[in-house]
Amino acid sequence: SFDELCNTVFQFQYQYNPVYHKWVDLIDSLPSERKIPQKIPALPISFFKEQQVKTGNWQEQKIFESSGTTGMVTSRHYVANLAIYEQSFLEGFERQYGSIQNWCVLALLPTYLERENSSLVYMANKMIAMSGHSESGFYLYNYAELANKIAALESRGQPTLLLGVTFALLDFAAQFPMQLTYTVVMETGGMKGRGRELTRPELHETLIERLSLPSIHAEYGMTELLSQAYSKSGGRYYCPPWMKVFVRKEDDPLAILTEGT
Protein backbone atom coordinates (compact mmCIF):
# COMPACT_ATOMS: atom_id res chain seq x y z
CA SER A 1 0.00 0.00 0.00
CA PHE A 2 0.98 3.66 -0.25
CA ASP A 3 1.45 3.93 3.52
CA GLU A 4 3.69 0.86 3.66
CA LEU A 5 5.80 2.11 0.77
CA CYS A 6 6.15 5.51 2.46
CA ASN A 7 7.40 3.87 5.64
CA THR A 8 9.91 1.77 3.68
CA VAL A 9 11.22 4.86 1.89
CA PHE A 10 11.39 6.80 5.16
CA GLN A 11 13.46 4.08 6.85
CA PHE A 12 15.78 3.90 3.83
CA GLN A 13 16.24 7.68 3.76
CA TYR A 14 16.83 7.79 7.50
CA GLN A 15 19.48 5.10 7.26
CA TYR A 16 21.41 6.29 4.19
CA ASN A 17 20.89 10.07 3.97
CA PRO A 18 23.14 11.74 6.59
CA VAL A 19 21.45 15.15 6.32
CA TYR A 20 17.99 13.67 6.78
CA HIS A 21 19.23 11.31 9.50
CA LYS A 22 20.56 14.20 11.56
CA TRP A 23 17.39 16.24 11.04
CA VAL A 24 15.12 13.39 12.12
CA ASP A 25 17.25 12.72 15.20
CA LEU A 26 16.87 16.37 16.22
CA ILE A 27 13.08 16.53 15.96
CA ASP A 28 11.79 12.97 16.30
CA SER A 29 12.18 10.97 19.50
CA LEU A 30 11.16 7.70 17.82
CA PRO A 31 12.85 7.58 14.39
CA SER A 32 12.79 3.77 14.16
CA GLU A 33 9.05 3.59 14.79
CA ARG A 34 6.81 2.59 11.89
CA LYS A 35 5.45 5.78 10.32
CA ILE A 36 2.25 6.67 8.52
CA PRO A 37 2.78 9.41 5.90
CA GLN A 38 1.34 12.14 8.15
CA LYS A 39 4.00 11.39 10.79
CA ILE A 40 7.04 11.28 8.51
CA PRO A 41 9.22 14.37 9.12
CA ALA A 42 9.57 16.55 6.03
CA LEU A 43 12.99 17.96 5.14
CA PRO A 44 13.00 21.80 4.99
CA ILE A 45 13.84 23.02 1.49
CA SER A 46 16.38 25.43 3.01
CA PHE A 47 18.64 22.40 3.52
CA PHE A 48 18.93 22.08 -0.27
CA LYS A 49 20.53 25.54 -0.25
CA GLU A 50 22.91 24.86 2.62
CA GLN A 51 23.93 21.21 2.35
CA GLN A 52 24.50 18.39 -0.12
CA VAL A 53 21.37 16.27 0.24
CA LYS A 54 22.20 12.79 -1.07
CA THR A 55 21.04 9.30 -0.11
CA GLY A 56 24.02 6.98 -0.38
CA ASN A 57 27.43 7.55 -1.93
CA TRP A 58 27.36 8.13 -5.68
CA GLN A 59 28.42 10.54 -8.41
CA GLU A 60 25.53 12.70 -9.54
CA GLN A 61 24.48 12.59 -13.19
CA LYS A 62 22.97 16.07 -12.97
CA ILE A 63 22.58 18.94 -10.50
CA PHE A 64 19.35 20.92 -10.85
CA GLU A 65 19.28 24.44 -9.43
CA SER A 66 16.31 26.59 -8.42
CA SER A 67 15.70 30.03 -9.90
CA GLY A 68 16.86 33.12 -8.04
CA THR A 69 18.10 36.66 -8.53
CA THR A 70 21.81 37.42 -8.87
CA GLY A 71 23.66 36.71 -5.65
CA MET A 72 20.83 34.67 -4.15
CA VAL A 73 21.66 31.24 -2.75
CA THR A 74 19.73 28.65 -4.77
CA SER A 75 18.63 25.12 -4.00
CA ARG A 76 20.70 22.33 -5.52
CA HIS A 77 19.17 18.92 -6.18
CA TYR A 78 21.70 16.16 -6.87
CA VAL A 79 20.26 13.51 -9.20
CA ALA A 80 21.85 10.08 -9.48
CA ASN A 81 19.72 8.78 -12.37
CA LEU A 82 17.94 11.09 -14.81
CA ALA A 83 15.97 8.17 -16.25
CA ILE A 84 13.95 8.02 -13.01
CA TYR A 85 13.07 11.72 -13.32
CA GLU A 86 12.09 11.23 -16.96
CA GLN A 87 9.88 8.25 -16.12
CA SER A 88 8.27 10.26 -13.31
CA PHE A 89 7.37 13.39 -15.29
CA LEU A 90 6.30 11.45 -18.39
CA GLU A 91 3.96 9.11 -16.53
CA GLY A 92 2.66 11.97 -14.39
CA PHE A 93 1.78 13.99 -17.50
CA GLU A 94 0.31 11.10 -19.46
CA ARG A 95 -1.98 10.09 -16.58
CA GLN A 96 -3.69 13.46 -16.96
CA TYR A 97 -3.31 14.25 -20.67
CA GLY A 98 -2.77 11.01 -22.56
CA SER A 99 0.21 10.10 -24.72
CA ILE A 100 2.76 12.87 -25.18
CA GLN A 101 2.93 11.79 -28.83
CA ASN A 102 -0.56 13.22 -29.38
CA TRP A 103 0.69 16.72 -28.59
CA CYS A 104 2.69 19.46 -30.20
CA VAL A 105 4.61 20.96 -27.27
CA LEU A 106 5.46 24.67 -27.32
CA ALA A 107 7.52 25.89 -24.35
CA LEU A 108 7.52 29.61 -23.52
CA LEU A 109 10.15 29.69 -20.79
CA PRO A 110 12.30 32.84 -20.98
CA THR A 111 14.63 33.40 -17.99
CA TYR A 112 14.43 29.66 -17.28
CA LEU A 113 15.77 28.83 -20.73
CA GLU A 114 18.47 31.45 -20.33
CA ARG A 115 20.05 29.77 -17.32
CA GLU A 116 21.58 26.36 -16.85
CA ASN A 117 20.42 23.45 -14.71
CA SER A 118 16.67 24.15 -14.62
CA SER A 119 14.63 21.01 -13.96
CA LEU A 120 11.65 22.65 -15.71
CA VAL A 121 13.66 23.28 -18.88
CA TYR A 122 15.00 19.72 -18.75
CA MET A 123 11.45 18.37 -18.51
CA ALA A 124 10.17 20.60 -21.31
CA ASN A 125 13.09 19.69 -23.56
CA LYS A 126 12.45 15.97 -23.08
CA MET A 127 8.70 16.39 -23.62
CA ILE A 128 9.40 18.24 -26.87
CA ALA A 129 11.61 15.37 -28.03
CA MET A 130 9.20 12.68 -26.81
CA SER A 131 6.27 14.30 -28.61
CA GLY A 132 7.95 13.50 -31.91
CA HIS A 133 6.16 16.50 -33.45
CA SER A 134 8.29 18.43 -35.94
CA GLU A 135 6.84 21.77 -34.82
CA SER A 136 7.40 21.30 -31.08
CA GLY A 137 10.01 23.66 -29.67
CA PHE A 138 11.14 26.44 -27.32
CA TYR A 139 10.34 30.14 -27.54
CA LEU A 140 11.92 33.10 -25.77
CA TYR A 141 10.49 36.55 -26.57
CA ASN A 142 9.61 35.90 -30.24
CA TYR A 143 5.89 36.24 -29.58
CA ALA A 144 4.90 36.98 -33.18
CA GLU A 145 6.51 33.76 -34.37
CA LEU A 146 4.79 31.85 -31.57
CA ALA A 147 1.40 33.38 -32.44
CA ASN A 148 1.81 32.40 -36.09
CA LYS A 149 2.79 28.87 -35.10
CA ILE A 150 -0.23 28.45 -32.80
CA ALA A 151 -2.57 29.84 -35.48
CA ALA A 152 -1.23 27.33 -38.01
CA LEU A 153 -1.63 24.43 -35.57
CA GLU A 154 -5.15 25.58 -34.66
CA SER A 155 -6.13 25.68 -38.33
CA ARG A 156 -5.18 22.00 -38.61
CA GLY A 157 -6.92 20.98 -35.38
CA GLN A 158 -3.63 19.86 -33.83
CA PRO A 159 -3.77 19.35 -30.04
CA THR A 160 -1.13 21.73 -28.71
CA LEU A 161 0.34 22.29 -25.26
CA LEU A 162 1.59 25.82 -24.60
CA LEU A 163 3.69 25.49 -21.45
CA GLY A 164 4.76 28.86 -20.13
CA VAL A 165 5.91 30.96 -17.20
CA THR A 166 3.30 33.39 -15.92
CA PHE A 167 4.81 36.71 -16.96
CA ALA A 168 5.58 35.49 -20.49
CA LEU A 169 2.06 34.12 -21.00
CA LEU A 170 0.60 37.45 -19.83
CA ASP A 171 2.86 39.42 -22.18
CA PHE A 172 2.09 37.09 -25.08
CA ALA A 173 -1.68 37.19 -24.52
CA ALA A 174 -1.63 41.00 -24.22
CA GLN A 175 0.18 41.40 -27.55
CA PHE A 176 -1.54 38.57 -29.43
CA PRO A 177 -5.06 37.87 -28.14
CA MET A 178 -6.38 34.75 -29.87
CA GLN A 179 -9.36 32.43 -29.96
CA LEU A 180 -8.01 29.01 -29.08
CA THR A 181 -9.83 25.71 -29.50
CA TYR A 182 -7.22 22.98 -29.73
CA THR A 183 -4.57 24.54 -27.49
CA VAL A 184 -4.10 23.87 -23.77
CA VAL A 185 -2.41 26.80 -22.04
CA MET A 186 -0.52 25.62 -18.96
CA GLU A 187 1.17 28.05 -16.58
CA THR A 188 4.07 27.05 -14.38
CA GLY A 189 4.13 30.11 -12.11
CA GLY A 190 6.88 32.71 -12.22
CA MET A 191 6.10 36.40 -11.58
CA LYS A 192 8.84 37.29 -9.08
CA GLY A 193 10.34 40.69 -9.82
CA ARG A 194 7.94 41.33 -12.69
CA GLY A 195 5.70 43.99 -11.17
CA ARG A 196 2.58 43.33 -9.13
CA GLU A 197 2.15 39.62 -8.63
CA LEU A 198 -1.35 38.55 -9.58
CA THR A 199 -3.32 36.04 -7.59
CA ARG A 200 -3.88 32.80 -9.48
CA PRO A 201 -7.62 33.56 -10.04
CA GLU A 202 -6.69 37.00 -11.45
CA LEU A 203 -4.05 35.48 -13.70
CA HIS A 204 -6.35 32.78 -15.04
CA GLU A 205 -9.22 35.21 -15.57
CA THR A 206 -6.96 37.49 -17.62
CA LEU A 207 -5.62 34.66 -19.79
CA ILE A 208 -9.08 33.12 -20.26
CA GLU A 209 -10.42 36.45 -21.52
CA ARG A 210 -7.52 37.20 -23.87
CA LEU A 211 -7.23 33.69 -25.31
CA SER A 212 -10.94 32.76 -25.35
CA LEU A 213 -10.43 29.59 -23.33
CA PRO A 214 -12.77 27.80 -20.90
CA SER A 215 -9.95 27.35 -18.37
CA ILE A 216 -6.22 27.70 -17.80
CA HIS A 217 -4.25 24.64 -16.80
CA ALA A 218 -1.36 24.72 -14.34
CA GLU A 219 1.68 22.63 -13.50
CA TYR A 220 3.23 22.65 -10.05
CA GLY A 221 6.74 21.41 -9.55
CA MET A 222 9.85 22.42 -7.66
CA THR A 223 13.58 21.86 -7.91
CA GLU A 224 13.63 19.95 -4.62
CA LEU A 225 10.82 17.58 -5.66
CA LEU A 226 11.04 15.74 -8.98
CA SER A 227 7.30 15.07 -9.34
CA GLN A 228 4.56 17.33 -10.69
CA ALA A 229 0.93 18.03 -9.89
CA TYR A 230 -1.49 19.29 -12.56
CA SER A 231 -4.61 21.43 -12.47
CA LYS A 232 -7.06 21.55 -15.39
CA SER A 233 -9.22 24.32 -13.92
CA GLY A 234 -9.99 26.20 -10.73
CA GLY A 235 -6.63 25.62 -9.09
CA ARG A 236 -7.45 22.07 -7.97
CA TYR A 237 -4.31 19.99 -8.42
CA TYR A 238 -4.09 16.26 -9.01
CA CYS A 239 -0.99 14.30 -8.00
CA PRO A 240 0.35 11.04 -9.43
CA PRO A 241 -0.26 8.02 -7.17
CA TRP A 242 3.27 8.12 -5.74
CA MET A 243 2.84 11.70 -4.47
CA LYS A 244 0.78 13.07 -1.59
CA VAL A 245 0.74 16.62 -0.23
CA PHE A 246 0.61 17.73 3.40
CA VAL A 247 0.95 21.27 4.72
CA ARG A 248 3.05 21.48 7.88
CA LYS A 249 3.07 24.21 10.50
CA GLU A 250 6.08 26.49 10.11
CA ASP A 251 6.92 26.27 13.81
CA ASP A 252 6.25 22.53 14.15
CA PRO A 253 7.55 20.24 11.37
CA LEU A 254 5.60 17.27 12.75
CA ALA A 255 2.20 18.99 12.87
CA ILE A 256 -0.22 19.01 9.92
CA LEU A 257 -1.85 22.39 9.23
CA THR A 258 -5.59 21.94 8.69
CA GLU A 259 -6.88 25.52 8.64
CA GLY A 260 -6.39 27.75 5.63
CA THR A 261 -5.37 24.88 3.34
Regions found by a protein language model. Name each.
Residues 28, 68-70, 247-249:
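Short acidic, glycine-rich loop/turn motifs
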Residues 74-78, 108, 116-119, 173-175:
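Short, conserved acidic/polar surface loops in the N-terminal third of protein domains
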Residues 70, 85, 89-128:
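Internal, well-ordered alpha/beta segment that forms a basic, Gly-enriched binding/recognition surface
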Residues 3-12, 16-18, 102, 111, ...:
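Active-site glycine/GP-rich loop and adjacent strand/helix microenvironment
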Residues 70-73, 223:
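Gly/Ser/Thr-rich beta-alpha loop segments that engage phosphate groups in nucleotides
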Residues 15-65, 73-78, 86-101:
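Active-site diphosphate/adenylate-binding microenvironment
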Residues 79-83, 201:
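Short, conserved loop/turn and helix-capping segments at secondary-structure boundaries
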